[in-house]
């Protein structure tokens, strides 16, 4: 339980509502720092006196609120018939190198290391 609580704290989901969510549910998104500045997908946020804030003088910091991790989390787990699946991220110039994912165990969900898509073998 301590590990689950630590993970919840990392996601800022320690309330009762967070514990009632299914274990596979993930909640990511744009967070705001204590100074009111939006935090990027890498966790980048600067103090008021940080010299790197010079980039944002006279304009606001723009943060894309569609983080890739959120978009991947919305994708359902793909049920496949075969024991080994090949993922190339869509192929062509928009894809990634082809990787083969073993789906041997009944409860195992294989995840592509490049794009994060998840696959599960459909057992009859």
Swiss-Prot record:
Cellular compartment(s): Mitochondrion inner membrane
Listed Gene3D superfamilies: q5lls5 like domains (2.60.260.40)
Transit peptide range per the UniProt entry: 1-28
InterPro entries membership: NDUFS6, Znf_CHCC
GO cellular component, one term: respiratory chain complex I
Keywords per UniProt: Acetylation, Electron transport, Membrane, Mitochondrion, Mitochondrion inner membrane, Respiratory chain, Transit peptide, Transport
GO biological process, one term: mitochondrial electron transport, NADH to ubiquinone
Chain coiled-coil ranges: none
Modified residues (N6-acetyllysine): 98
Membrane topology annotation: Peripheral membrane protein
Family, per entry: Belongs to the complex I NDUFS6 subunit family.
Function: Accessory subunit of the mitochondrial membrane respiratory chain NADH dehydrogenase (Complex I), that is believed not to be involved in catalysis. Complex I functions in the transfer of electrons from NADH to the respiratory chain. The immediate electron acceptor for the enzyme is believed to be ubiquinone.
Protein name listed in UniProt: NADH dehydrogenase [ubiquinone] iron-sulfur protein 6, mitochondrial
Originating species: Gorilla gorilla gorilla (Western lowland gorilla)
């Amino acid at each position: 339980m301590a590990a689950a609580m630590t993970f919840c704290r990392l996601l800022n989901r320690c309330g009762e509502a967070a514990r009632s969510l299914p274990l596979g549910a993930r909640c990511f998104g744009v967070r705001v720092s204590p100074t009111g500045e939006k935090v990027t997908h890498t966790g980048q946020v600067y103090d008021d006196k940080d010299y790197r804030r010079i980039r944002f003088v006279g304009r606001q910091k723009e943060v894309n609120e569609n983080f890739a991790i959120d978009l991947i989390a919305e994708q359902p787990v793909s049920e496949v018939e075969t024991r080994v699946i090949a993922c190339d991220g869509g192929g062509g110039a928009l894809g990634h190198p082809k990787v083969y994912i073993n789906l041997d165990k009944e409860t195992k969900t294989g995840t592509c290391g490049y794009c994060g898509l998840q696959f599960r073998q459909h057992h009859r």
